[in-house]
């Protein structure tokens, strides 16, 4: 069966910077290299400061925060107010979808029609529920990506910007443009893949840029969305 992480009752001690270069060893086979595939080289280390809790005087970290790494930042000014292991490298899972969303928003008209393949509709992991053979607007697919964390919508959007390889090149280029020096995106949907890495600091950069984008901010502020159906597949909310 799938590996299930243990329940924590305290935050891990990161004072010794255990994740300074790369995430901890994978606990499943999801990052197993294909035959002949080289081991990815981690991004160069750019931070040599402390890796524990870094807070201003008088700041009390809530007792129920058990994350290995986190950052509290002002989305308007970009100022980081408090943090823990800010440049420690971790697997981002689906929160890395923010980069794909920004690339798509910057590149495609929201009303562009995108056909959906069997490969898109049948992606593993979380799915919004789009149907193979259907056609959806970029706006529809972005809502499925950001509201339902759809790996199916992520795959469909990636094909619309040139395919998997092009999408990975573009999201990694955007990460570098944003100054995300701890980040390597090996999977634009957040599924585990060899070399996948980001940090709390980098994600603060990505989400600050995202919330300054009116289209992104509007989508994630949506309470509900009517997803269209087609043929015998009904629409859904």
Q: Where would I find each of the regions flagged by the language model?
A:
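Short, glycine-anchored, charge-dense loop/turn motifs used at functional sites
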Residues: 70-81, 100
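N-terminal post-signal-peptidase region of extra-cytosolic proteins
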Residues: 83-95, 126-127
């Amino acid at each position: 069966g799938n590996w299930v992480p243990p329940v924590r009752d305290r935050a891990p001690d990161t004072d010794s910077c255990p994740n300074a270069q790369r995430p901890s060893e994978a606990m499943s086979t999801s990052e197993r290299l294909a035959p002949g595939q080289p081991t990815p080289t981690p991004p160069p280390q750019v931070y040599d400061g402390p890796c524990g809790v870094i807070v201003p005087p008088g700041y009390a970290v809530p007792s129920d925060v058990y994350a290995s790494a986190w950052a509290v930042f002002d989305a308007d000014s970009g100022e980081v107010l408090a943090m823990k292991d800010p440049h420690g490298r971790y697997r981002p899972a689906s929160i890395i979808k923010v980069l794909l969303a920004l690339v798509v928003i910057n590149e495609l008209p929201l009303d562009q029609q995108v056909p959906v393949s069997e490969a898109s509709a049948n992606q593993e992991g979380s799915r919004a529920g789009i149907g193979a053979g259907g056609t959806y607007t970029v706006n529809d697919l972005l809502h499925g990506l950001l509201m339902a964390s759809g790996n199916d919508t992520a795959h469909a959007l990636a094909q619309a910007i040139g395919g998997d390889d092009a999408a990975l090149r573009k999201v990694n280029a955007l990460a570098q443009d944003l100054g995300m020096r701890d980040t390597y995106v090996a999977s634009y949907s957040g599924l585990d893949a060899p070399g996948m890495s980001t940090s709390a600091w980098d994600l603060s950069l990505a989400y600050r840029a995202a919330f300054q984008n009116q289209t992104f901010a509007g989508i994630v502020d949506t309470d509900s969305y009517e997803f269209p159906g087609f043929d015998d597949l009904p629409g859904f909310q």
